[in-house]
Amino acid sequence: VAFYLLEVRGQRGPIVKTLSSGNMLDKLGKLYGVPVHETGVGFKFVAPKMVETDAMIGGEESGGYAFKGNVPERDGILGNLLFLDFMVKTGKKPSQLLQSLFDKVGAHYYDRIDTKFPSEQRDSVRQRVAAVKPGITMGGLTVESIDTTDGFKFVFADGQGWCLVRFSGPEPLIRVYC
């Protein structure tokens, strides 16, 4: 939907996304000359940042989007109407729109894995994740930087992507986004 607002409607304004969202929005922001702000996970962080920056769109990994001029909260109806308008104005099917986006910013892939672990191991698991430092190799990729705003986001060198590890508050559960 951000691609539609930028490309078809010609709108310009900040974009707000969560740490767990992919980096397509960063590439769109760079391409169209608009700032992209990253927040903690959840609309409790997205909404205030949208108001603060007068953002044109804000969203999170789960598919929730909010839009300038509307309540800064997830609005699936408006998001779907905008997507339908994108299809009508371009005459393209969703698969063709996705290909158009990939043509602009390159193909992107995303996954989230939720993994349970024994609750008595919470501290040791957290310590192992926290022990990762820049320069360490994970899965053949070198960690360039780490953002601990909301979990542990490992950004890999040479634009090779990122991996966010978040611990569930009440459950012995790790959420891994990449």
Task: Go through each PLM region and give its residues.
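Phosphate-binding and adjacent anionic-ligand microenvironments
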Residues: 7-178
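Extended, hydrophobic alpha-helical segments in both membrane/secreted and soluble proteins
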Residues: 1-2, 25
